Curated annotation (Swiss-Prot):
There is a cross-link at G1-N30 (Cyclopeptide (Gly-Asn)). InterPro entries: Cyclotide (IPR005535), Cyclotide_bracelet_CS (IPR012323), Cyclotide_sf (IPR036146). Disulfide bonds join C4-C20, C8-C22, C13-C27. This is a cyclic peptide. It holds the Pfam family Cyclotide. The presence of a 'disulfide through disulfide knot' structurally defines this protein as a knottin. This is Chassatide C3. Expressed in fruit, pedicel, stem and root but not in leaf (at protein level). One of its GO terms (biological process) is defense response. Belongs to the cyclotide family. Bracelet subfamily. Probably participates in a plant defense mechanism. It comes from Chassalia chartacea (Chassalia curviflora). Keywords: Disulfide bond, Knottin, Plant defense.
């Protein structure tokens, strides 16, 4: 539930390496 400051509209979350995932076109962690 914490925004990672990254969007995932066109590309996947680069921050997925830090445990972030795409939700509603924004990358979140927990």
């Amino acid at each position: 539930g914490i925004p990672c400051g990254e969007s995932c509209v066109w590309i996947p979350c680069i921050s997925s390496a830090l445990g972030c995932s795409c939700k509603n076109k924004v990358c979140y962690r927990n």
